Amino acid sequence: MRGYHVGGRSLTWGRQSYRLTDFDFEANWKDGIAVDWPIRYKDLAPWYDYVEGYIGVSGQNVGLPQFPDGNYLKPMELNCVEDHLQGSISEKYNDRLLTIGRTAIITEGTKPGLGRSTCQYRSRCMRGCPFGAYFSSNSSTLPAAEKTGNMTLRPNSIVNEVIYDADQKRATGVRVIDTETKEVYEFKNPGVALSMFNLDNS
């Protein structure tokens, strides 16, 4: 599902926020079936810390190598059924656990943006959180970008090509299609950051 609106998929994703591990980064190399990743977990760890701190990710640190701990806010509460199941699992198994998902939802304090506050547990998530508790571009990064005075918001635009300069060996801009007029525009910038939904862009 593509989001043809300001905020895109940041308004409709499930907010589950997990770190990749070296199990993920080394799988191609160990299995010998594909190209090895050029990075490892240690390269991304400080950026995971930064993003989790900025957007507000709640969750529980559990000390599992395949499920890396992070810079989490207090976890959301389990419901009564989940709580009972968690107790049953811990009684019967010493090598298994049940934990709440790690979600980009503020459970304590506030985060930068347009009046973001904590989750009120009112089940309004699917209509867009009126409290700004769950992370979205509209409640966090767009207001922050607007405050810089250097942002131009251009809705109704689909990036169809990243402009690559072979001499500089870097992206120098994007080519977009206006969804209303079908005109093509180019935007140049020293830095290009892509934020996209993987299935729609693969």
Regions found by a protein language model. Give the residues of each.
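Conserved phosphate/anionic-ligand binding catalytic regions in large, soluble enzymes, centered on
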Residues: 4-15
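Conserved redox-cofactor binding core of oxidoreductases
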Residues: 14-19, 28-159
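A short, glycine/Asx- and small/polar-enriched loop/turn
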Residues: 113-114, 165-172
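Glycine-rich loop(s) and the adjacent beta-strand/alpha-helix scaffold that form part
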Residues: 148, 157, 161-165, 174-202
